[in-house]
Swiss-Prot record:
A family per Pfam: Zn_clus
Spans annotated as Disordered: 80-114, 158-193, 794-827
Native source organism of the sequence: Schizosaccharomyces pombe (strain 972 / ATCC 24843) (Fission yeast)
Name of the featured protein: Putative transcriptional regulatory protein C16G5.16
Alphabetic keyword roster: Cytoplasm, DNA-binding, Metal-binding, Nucleus, Phosphoprotein, Transcription, Transcription regulation, Zinc
Molecular function (Gene Ontology), one example: sequence-specific DNA binding
PTM-bearing positions, type Phosphoserine: 112
GO cellular component, one term: nucleus
Annotated region of DNA binding: 16-42
Primary location: cytoplasm
Biased composition (Basic and acidic residues): 102-112
Length: 827
C-alpha cells in the first residue's frame, strides 16, 4: 500500500448527524454551516450501524422458550387465559390467509373471551311519577337489582297473576307496582317545618349526643369530641354561640335520637324529635353564605340521618353539597404546614368522612361520584390528643376514640377500592348494545385488591382474634360486614351464572360461575355475621349493617330463584335468607327507621313463597332466639310500655303464623280481607297453608297490611306506599279496643288514627300520649349494667329540669310526676 492511499484514508472524516441523514456535504465545523443555516442542532454521534442478520436457529430458540414458559403458566393456573399473540402460529388460521369477514369474526371472538356479560344494562332505572317527577337509579343500586329479582320470580312463577297477565303487553313494568320493591324516596313537601324547636336539658342532651359517639362514630369521624363537648357546655351555660354550632348541635342530637332505645326514659318519642330537628335544619339552615368545617359537619350529619330514614336521594344531595364545601375549603389538599395540629387533624377526619359517605351513597343510588382519587392530596387521619382533665368529655369516649381510629382508616381503604371498581364492573358506556361487558383483567385486578386488603388486615380487627362480645369484637364484625357488602356489589353482575355448571372437566370452577359462587358465599357470610351480632346484648343499630343484610338477602333470594332445578341448592339459599331476615328483626326490632327496608325484605320472601312450586316445608322458620344471652332485651317495639304491643297476626289472616293477641279479644271478626293481585284470600290459591310466618318488627295498632301495591301516595317517611288497603283488624272510623293503663284501673281507648301506614313518628307528640317517668334518675341506656361514669348518669337534680305531662285521668299530684310548669327548656 502506497503512502498516498494511507494519507487519503486519513483525510476521510465523519459528517455531522444531520448532514449524514440528509446526505449533503458537511464542512465538519462545530457547528457546521448547514446546521447554522437551517437552525439545526449539530451533533457528532456514533456512526450508524447496519442491522445484522439473526443468528442461526434464533427463531426456533424463541419458540422453544415461549413453549416452556406457557407450560409453566398452565401448571400454576390451568384457567389462565394468555393473550392471543402468544398462541402458537397456525398457517390455516393465519390472518393473512383469511378473508376480511372471517378475520373480523375471529377478532370479535378473541375479544369476547376476555369479557363477561353483566346482569345489568347500562341504562339503569328511571321511574316517572304521576306528578311529573322523575327518579333515576343506576345499575349499581339495589333498586335495579330488586327489579331483576321481580322479573325472574315472575318468569319462573307457577301461579297465575291477573295483574301480570293484563300488563303483559307493556314492555317495561312499573316498579312501584311491585309489592316487595324498596319504595322510591320522595320529597317531604307536605311537611310544614317548625319555626322554633326546643332543645333538651344539658344532661339529657349530653346522654343523647354520647349515643352517637358510642355507636356510629368509629365508621365516620365527624367531630373532635373534646372541642365539641366544650362548645356544647358553653352553649348551655351562656346560651351564646355562633349560629353554625347551633345547627351542628341540632344535627348531632338528630343523629343521637336514632340510637335511643325505648328502655331509656330520657327520650320520649325520640323519632318524633329527630324528625322535627331534621325538618328544622332543612328549612332554616343556609350553607351557601359561608364555607366552614362546621358547615361540612352539619351537612354530613343531615346526610347520615337521611340514610337512617332511607332517604337515599336526599342523602346523595347532602353528601355532594358537603363534598363541594370540602373543595371550596381545600380539605382535599394537605396544608399541614400552614394549619395548626388540631385544625389539620380535624380537616383530615371531616374530609375522609365525607369521602367515605360519598362513595357509599353514590354506589347504592347508582349515580356518579363527584371526586376522583387522583384529585386527593390528603394524608390519612391520626388520633387526637385528649386532655383527661376536661370534665366535659366522657371517659369512655376517650377509649372509644383511640381504639376506633384504625377501623376508620380501614373503612377509608375499602371505600377507595369501592370507588375504583364501580366504574369498571358497572360501566356506563357500551360500544355495541345495551348489555354491558365486563373486562376480565379489570375484574382480576380489583379482586386482587380485595384479597390483599383482607389478608393484610390486622389480627386485632378480625372477629376470630378478639374476645367475644367485647367492643373490639363488635367493631371487627361491622368492619367485615362492610367488606362483605363490597364483595356482594363487586360479584353481583355475575350472579346470573350461578345456574351454570360449576365444575368443568379439570375440576376447577369456570370463571362466571366462580364469581357467582363467590357472591353467594359472601351473602351467606353476611348472614352468619348478623347471626353473631344478634347474640350480642349491645349491638349498635348501624345503617351499614342493615344495608349489608339487605343486599345479602336479595342475593340469596335471587340465587334461590335461579337454582329452581336443584331443590337442595335452592332450599339452602332460601333458608339462609329467612335466617338472615330473622336476625335483622332481632337487631332492628326497636328501630322505626328501618321498618321500610324490613318490610321490603319480608314482602320479597313472601313473594318467593307464593310463586314457589316446590313441596318443601316452609313453616319451619329458623329459630335463633334461643342463642341469645339471658340478659338480652327482647322487646318488639319502641313504643312505651303504656301502649299495647299488638302485632297484626291473626288466625284468619292469610298466613298460618298469625295469631290473635290477648288484648284484642273483643276484635270484630268481619273485617275485610286483604287482596292479592285482584283476588281475595278466600279464593283458591296454591299452597296457601304453606307460607312461613314473617313477623313484623315494628307494627302498631294503626298499621295496615302492606300486601298489594295499587296507586301510590307519598307518606311522611318519604316513601310511596299504596293508598288502597283493607284495614286490619278494625275499621278506621272506630276506636281501638280498651286496654288497662299501668297507673289506673279504668280502661282507656285509643282514638282513630289518620289513614297512612308506618307514619313516623308512630303517634303524634302530645302530652296525653307520653309515658310516665319510671324514676327520678335519668340514665343512659346500659349505664346501670356497665357502671357508666358521669355524665352518663343523670344527677337527682335533673328531675326539676325535665318536662313531664299530666296523667290522662287528671291525677297529676303524684310526687314522682312533676308538673310540666316547672320544666326548663332551652330554645
Amino acid at each position: 500500500m502506497s503512502s498516498g492511499d494511507v494519507s487519503r484514508r486519513q483525510r476521510v472524516s465523519r459528517a455531522c448527524d444531520e448532514c449524514h441523514r440528509r446526505k449533503i456535504k458537511c464542512d465538519q465545523r462545530r457547528p457546521c454551516s448547514n446546521c447554522i443555516a437551517y437552525n439545526y442542532e449539530c451533533t457528532y454521534g456514533q456512526p450508524f450501524k447496519r442491522l445484522r442478520h439473526a443468528p442461526e436457529k434464533y427463531i426456533e430458540f424463541l419458540e422453544l422458550r415461549l413453549k416452556y414458559l406457557r407450560g409453566l403458566a398452565e401448571e400454576s393456573d390451568p384457567n389462565l387465559k394468555l393473550p392471543s399473540f402468544l398462541a402458537p402460529p397456525n398457517d390455516k388460521d393465519s390472518p393473512v390467509n383469511q378473508s376480511p369477514w372471517k378475520r373480523s369474526d375471529s377478532s370479535k371472538r378473541s375479544s369476547s373471551q376476555d369479557e363477561f356479560e353483566s346482569l345489568f344494562d347500562r341504562y339503569g332505572q328511571l321511574s316517572l311519577k304521576d306528578d311529573g317527577k322523575a327518579d333515576f337509579r343506576g345499575s349499581s343500586s339495589g333498586f335495579v337489582f330488586m327489579k331483576n329479582i321481580h322479573q325472574n320470580i315472575a318468569r319462573n312463577s307457577t301461579v297465575p297473576n291477573p295483574v301480570q297477565e293484563s300488563n303483559s303487553s307493556s314492555s317495561q313494568p312499573d316498579p312501584l307496582s311491585f309489592p316487595y320493591l324498596p319504595p322510591t324516596p320522595a320529597e317531604d313537601e307536605h311537611k310544614k317545618p317548625p319555626l322554633k324547636i326546643q332543645l333538651p336539658p344539658y344532661e339529657e342532651a349530653l346522654s343523647i349526643v354520647s349515643q352517637f359517639f358510642m355507636n356510629d362514630h368509629f365508621l365516620v369521624h365527624i367531630h373532635h369530641p373534646a372541642s365539641f363537648f366544650e362548645k356544647m357546655h358553653m352553649y348551655y351555660k351562656t346560651g351564646k354561640t355562633d349560629n353554625n354550632f347551633h345547627f351542628l348541635l341540632v344535627a348531632t342530637l338528630c343523629l343521637g335520637y336514632t340510637y335511643m332505645p325505648d328502655e331509656s326514659p330520657s327520650a320520649n318519642y325520640p323519632y318524633h324529635e329527630a324528625y322535627e330537628y331534621y325538618y328544622y335544619i332543612r328549612s332554616s339552615f343556609s350553607w351557601e353564605d359561608s364555607y366552614t368545617i362546621e358547615v361540612v359537619q352539619i351537612l354530613l350529619s343531615v346526610a347520615l340521618f337521611a340514610l337512617f330514614s332511607s332517604r337515599l336521594s336526599q342523602a346523595y344531595t347532602f353528601t355532594n353539597n358537603a363534598l363541594l364545601c370540602c373543595h371550596e375549603l381545600g380539605l382535599h389538599k394537605d396544608f399541614s404546614d400552614v394549619l395548626t395540629s388540631h385544625e389539620s387533624r380535624l380537616s383530615k377526619r371531616v374530609f375522609y368522612s365525607v369521602y367515605v359517605l360519598a362513595c357509599y351513597t353514590s354506589t347504592i343510588v347508582g349515580l356518579p361520584l363527584s371526586i376522583e382519587d387522583v384529585d386527593i392530596d390528603q394524608s390519612l387521619p391520626n388520633s387526637f390528643d385528649f386532655t383527661l382533665e376536661n370534665d366535659q368529655v366522657p371517659p369512655r369516649l376517650i377509649a372509644s376514640e383511640c381504639t376506633s381510629l384504625e377501623v376508620f382508616i380501614q373503612h377509608i381503604t375499602l371505600s377507595r377500592i369501592l370507588s375504583h371498581f364501580v366504574r369498571k364492573v358497572y360501566p356506563v358506556k357500551s360500544p355495541s348494545d345495551s348489555h354491558c361487558k365486563v373486562s376480565l383483567p379489570a375484574v382480576r385486578d380489583h379482586e386482587e385488591k380485595l384479597t390483599y386488603w383482607w389478608k393484610n388486615l390486622p389480627s386485632y380487627l378480625k372477629m376470630s382474634e378478639v374476645p367475644k362480645f367485647s367492643p373490639k369484637w363488635i367493631q371487627a364484625i361491622i368492619l367485615e360486614l362492610k367488606f362483605r357488602q363490597i364483595e356482594l356489589i363487586f360479584y353481583r353482575p355475575f350472579i346470573h351464572s350461578i345456574s351454570t355448571p360449576i365444575d368443568n372437566q379439570n375440576g376447577s370452577p369456570m370463571k362466571p360461575a366462580n364469581f357467582a359462587l363467590k357472591c353467594a358465599q359472601s351473602a351467606e357470610r353476611v348472614v352468619f355475621l348478623l347471626q353473631e351480632l344478634a347474640k350480642s346484648p349491645n349491638t349498635p343499630k348501624l345503617f351499614f349493617n342493615l344495608y349489608s343484610g339487605y343486599y345479602a338477602l336479595m342475593t340469596l333470594t335471587y340465587c334461590a330463584t335461579l337454582t329452581k332445578d336443584d331443590a337442595n341448592k335452592s332450599n339452602n339459599f332460601i333458608t339462609k335468607a329467612r335466617l338472615g331476615f330473622h336476625c335483622l328483626q332481632m337487631i332492628y326490632r326497636e328501630s322505626t327507621y328501618y321498618s321500610t327496608i324490613m318490610e321490603a325484605i319480608k314482602n320479597l320472601l313472601i313473594a318467593y313463597d307464593m310463586n314457589s312450586s316446590g313441596t318443601e316445608n316452609l313453616d319451619a322458620t329458623p329459630d335463633v332466639t334461643g342463642q341469645l344471652p339471658n340478659n338480652f332485651s327482647q322487646r318488639t317495639s319502641n313504643i312505651p310500655r303504656e301502649f299495647p304491643q299488638a302485632q297484626i297476626f291473626y288466625s284468619d289472616a292469610p298466613y298460618p303464623g298469625y295469631y290473635n293477641p290477648a288484648q284484642f279479644q273483643n276484635a270484630p271478626t268481619n273485617f275485610p280481607m286483604p287482596t292479592y293481585g285482584g283476588r281475595t284470600q278466600d279464593q283458591s290459591y296454591p299452597r296457601q297453608n304453606g307460607y312461613p310466618s314473617y313477623s313484623d318488627g315494628n307494627v302498631y295498632p294503626h298499621d295496615r297490611v302492606m300486601i298489594n301495591y295499587g296507586s301510590s301516595m307519598p307518606t311522611a317517611n318519604g316513601f310511596y306506599v299504596p293508598n288502597t288497603y283493607s284495614p286490619v283488624p278494625f275499621p278506621y272510623n272506630t276506636s281501638y279496643p280498651p286496654y288497662m293503663s299501668p297507673t289506673s284501673n279504668m280502661p282507656q281507648a285509643f282514638q282513630a288514627y289518620s289513614q297512612y301506614p308506618y307514619q313516623h313518628p308512630p303517634f303524634p307528640l302530645s302530652e296525653q300520649m307520653l309515658p310516665l317517668p319510671t324514676s327520678g334518675v335519668m340514665m343512659a341506656p346500659g349505664a346501670a349494667k356497665s357502671g357508666m361514669p358521669y355524665p352518663f348518669i343523670q344527677p337527682p337534680s335533673m328531675t326539676n329540669q325535665v318536662a313531664y305531662p299530666t296523667v290522662r285521668d287528671g291525677s297529676n299530684n303524684s310526687p314522682d310526676h312533676p308538673s310540666s310548669s316547672n320544666s326548663k327548656r332551652t330554645e
